[in-house]
């Protein structure tokens, strides 16, 4: 019975470590994406350029994969005695992505309302200009796009970013966790490092 208690306690400790590390790494990932957004803003890149869109998409994918892989490996090696199950890795990376997404939403909302209140309007105008230059776009579709752009607010834009970021996080969490999992050592009784091992 005592052994079962120790195992339950060890499992609780594991999930506490997963949660705490997820928050820490999530804050770091959120800061990385904010830094990237500021670079784009300061450099005044054309967000609607096809090449920019492709490069940015590849860069975001690379950041997610490398960061999630690094975070799970750090957690497994330094905190969880060298083993990590797939559900644990998935939970850890999803927490990271969720925290990063929340930080991004808060930043985007403050950016749209305080730092550059005209930013959304400018982006909307560029979108409409691009659509109007498309001769194959039906008038009805153009009107629908214009209506949606007119209804866009900082809160709506930030929430859309939240949904997108969380979806991306979950997809890459599913993939990366499959490669960062590692079976438990058969001689490991608790799954956690002893104080001597942690020193």
At which residue positions do the language-model features occur?
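Transmembrane alpha-helical segments in integral membrane proteins
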Residues: 154-185
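Alpha-helical transmembrane segments of multipass membrane proteins
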Residues: 32-40, 60-67, 100-104, 108, ...
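Low-complexity, intrinsically disordered extramembrane tails and loops of integral membrane proteins
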Residues: 1-16, 184-199
């Amino acid at each position: 019975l005592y052994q079962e208690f120790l195992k339950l306690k060890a499992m609780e400790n594991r999930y506490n470590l997963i949660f705490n590390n997820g928050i820490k790494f999530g804050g770091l990932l959120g800061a990385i994406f904010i830094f990237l957004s500021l670079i784009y803003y300061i450099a005044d890149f054309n967000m609607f350029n096809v090449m920019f869109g492709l490069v940015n998409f590849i860069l975001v994918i690379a950041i997610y994969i490398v960061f999630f892989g690094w975070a799970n490996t750090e957690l497994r090696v330094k905190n969880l005695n060298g083993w990590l199950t797939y559900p644990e890795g998935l939970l850890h990376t999803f927490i990271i992505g969720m925290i990063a997404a929340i930080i991004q939403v808060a930043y985007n909302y403050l950016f749209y309302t305080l730092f550059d209140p005209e930013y959304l309007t400018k982006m909307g105008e560029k979108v409409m200009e691009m659509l109007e230059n498309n001769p194959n776009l039906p008038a009805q579709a153009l009107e629908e796009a214009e209506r949606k752009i007119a209804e866009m607010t900082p809160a709506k834009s930030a929430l859309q970013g939240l949904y997108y970021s969380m979806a991306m996080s979950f997809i890459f969490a599913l993939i990366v966790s499959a490669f960062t999992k590692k079976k438990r050592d058969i001689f490991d009784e608790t799954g956690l490092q002893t104080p001597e091992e942690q020193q």
